[in-house]
């Protein structure tokens, strides 16, 4: 009886812990994460204080923090080739990182670190030197900065069959030396690394290449982590938020369902299908059943995005900043529709897959610069600073915890819907105008369209819609309008 009771208690504790790992620990009504890809720590700290906090962003996903290999030309992917767990990269050192986390937490913006638990660096001719000056011999699986040696890795093999679980989880992903997460030593070093980040005040982790690690091994690692730091404002017993990179197109041998109980999972099908729709390959009317109706994960288990730092560089349906009108429309729908844990992308300009972040002649990452409108101008794209995107972050905050209602469509790619009695979105992805009296569900009054402008000193700088006593308003979105979307909410009422 005692053994049975103990087993039940352990199961309940484990279940509670994994459920807690789905909680992103947002402040108030905030509920959007931004990925400030390759930004420096001091620039992120300033952005939290000057822009993200004031505009209601909930958190930042930051690039990998651990020491990485130095590759010729400094491509972005060198950050995904660890040399040690020292917190020194081109984004800054441990002191810079700790200062950034503290300053962002102070203004209600949480930090989530992209962590590399699957592997170390790939082959390198001779001795490699990392960003903290640590030497390693990746070809010999020798990483004295941790330290790891050959016995801490799976035997080298190439992934040639993506339907072979053994290859996917024990061979080398694009030649990266594959750690053995079942090893007590490897587990201890990974837990030590993550716990140190928790001590510094982070709210959670994006786990890179999660599908290439056995779910049981990850479960052990996650459950062994410390609670979040109360010194950084987290409540007692708060668990780190976990979201895991698992690419699953629905026919994978290693599936997302093996990981979604451990934490949230990146819902790549969301990205692909929203790109298809707003590129015109699917009528928007079908988005009424968006989310689980499309076979996606349950809302609280799905990390959703229009694009990420990987797939924005690939050919195909995925939208990126290079198709700005469609990208802004897709992002508006993403942030308005009540599904998923939302993350928006903040990129730098690229011409090919390997393009480095903006850097100077000494290969130091440069800080973003802004024009009079607040947009980035020196190689950083900063989609999160586009009015049409940060305004939708505010929309998402204003309508939090409301249901979708009053879906309307024209039988093709003009749609609208309400979020309770707090918000309304209309989209026109047809080649002809949308001109229609539509149910907005809003109280009577005049509302500013937060896509084309904003509410300033009691008046609208862009379009406005007058809502009558029955909740109806006349909506016009021309086919050649700069933006193909209109958004109203209660915090933008004149």
From Swiss-Prot:
Class of the enzyme per the UniProt entry, highest EC level: hydrolase
Predominant location category: secreted
Residues that, per the record, bind Ca(2+): 118, 169, 178, 212
Catalysed reaction equations from the record: Endohydrolysis of (1->4)-alpha-D-glucosidic linkages in polysaccharides containing three or more (1->4)-alpha-linked D-glucose units
Name this protein carries in UniProt: Alpha-amylase-related protein
Assembly, per entry: Monomer.
EC number(s) from the headed UniProt entry: 3.2.1.1
Family per similarity comment: Belongs to the glycosyl hydrolase 13 family.
Annotated organism of origin: Drosophila varians
InterPro entries: A-amylase/branching_C, A-amylase_C, Alpha_amylase, Glyco_hydro_13_cat_dom, Glyco_hydro_b, Glycoside_hydrolase_SF
Residues that hold chloride according to the record: 206, 308, 343
A GO CC term attached to the entry: extracellular region
Keyword Hydrolase applies: yes
Cofactor(s) it depends on: Ca(2+); chloride
Span of the signal peptide: 1-20
Cofactor, free-text remark: Binds 1 Ca(2+) ion per subunit. Binds 1 Cl(-) ion per subunit.
Active-site residues, record numbering mapped to chain: 208 (nucleophile), 245 (proton donor)
Gene: Amyrel
This protein's UniProt keywords: Calcium, Carbohydrate metabolism, Chloride, Disulfide bond, Glycosidase, Hydrolase, Metal-binding, Pyrrolidone carboxylic acid, Secreted, Signal
Compartments, as annotated in UniProt: Secreted
High-level lineage: Eukaryota, Metazoa, Ecdysozoa, Arthropoda, Hexapoda
């Amino acid at each position: 009886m005692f053994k049975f009771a103990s087993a039940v208690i352990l199961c309940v504790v484990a279940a509670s812990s994994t459920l807690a790992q789905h909680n992103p620990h947002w402040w108030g009504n905030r509920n959007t994460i931004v990925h400030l890809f390759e930004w420096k720590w001091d620039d992120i700290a300033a952005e939290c204080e000057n822009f993200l906090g004031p505009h209601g962003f909930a958190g930042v996903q930051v690039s990998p923090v651990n020491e990485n290999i130095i590759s010729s030309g400094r491509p972005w992917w060198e950050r995904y080739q660890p040399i040690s767990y020292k917190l020194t990269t081109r984004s800054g050192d441990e002191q810079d990182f700790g200062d950034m986390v503290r300053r962002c937490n102070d203004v209600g913006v949480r930090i989530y670190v992209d962590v590399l638990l699957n592997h170390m660096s790939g082959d390198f001719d001779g001795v490699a030197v990392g960003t903290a000056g640590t030497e390693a011999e990746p070809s010999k699986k020798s990483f004295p900065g941790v330290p790891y040696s050959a016995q801490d890795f799976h035997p080298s093999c190439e992934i040639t069959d993506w339907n072979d679980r053994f290859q996917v989880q024990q061979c080398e992903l694009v030649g990266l030396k594959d750690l053995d997460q079942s090893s007590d030593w490897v587990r201890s070093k990974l837990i030590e690394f993550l716990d140190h980040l928790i001590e510094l005040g982070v709210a959670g982790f994006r786990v890179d290449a999660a599908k290439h690690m056995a779910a049981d091994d990850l479960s052990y690692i996650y459950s062994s982590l410390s609670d979040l730091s109360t010194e950084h404002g987290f409540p007692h017993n708060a668990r780190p938020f976990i979201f895991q990179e698992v690419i699953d197109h629905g026919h994978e041998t290693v599936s997302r369902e093996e990981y979604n109980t451990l934490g949230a999972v990146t819902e790549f099908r969301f990205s692909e299908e929203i790109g298809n729709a707003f590129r015109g390959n699917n009528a928007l009317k079908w988005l009424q059943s968006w989310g689980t109706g499309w076979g996606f994960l349950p809302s609280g288990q799905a990390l959703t995005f229009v694009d990420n730092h990987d797939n924005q560089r690939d050919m195909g349906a995925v939208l990126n900043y290079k198709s700005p009108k469609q990208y802004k429309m897709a992002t508006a729908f993403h942030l308005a529709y009540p599904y998923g844990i939302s993350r928006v992308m903040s990129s730098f300009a690229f011409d090919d897959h390997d393009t480095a972040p903006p850097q100077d002649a000494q290969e130091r990452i440069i800080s973003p610069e802004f024009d009079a409108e607040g947009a980035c101008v020196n190689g950083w794209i900063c989609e999160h600073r586009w009015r049409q995107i940060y305004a939708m972050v505010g929309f998402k905050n204003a309508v939090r915890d409301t249901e979708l209602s009053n879906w309307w469509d024209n039988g093709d790619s003009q749609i609208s819907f309400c979020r309770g009695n707090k918000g309304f979105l209309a989209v026109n992805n047809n080649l002809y105008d949308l001109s229609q009296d539509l149910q907005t569900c809003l109280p009577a009054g005049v509302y500013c369209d937060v896509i084309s402008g904003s509410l300033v000193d009691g008046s609208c700088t862009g379009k406005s819609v007058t809502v009558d006593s029955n909740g109806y308003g006349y909506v016009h979105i021309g086919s050649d309008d700069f933006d193909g979307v209109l958004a109203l909410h209660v915090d933008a009422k004149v």
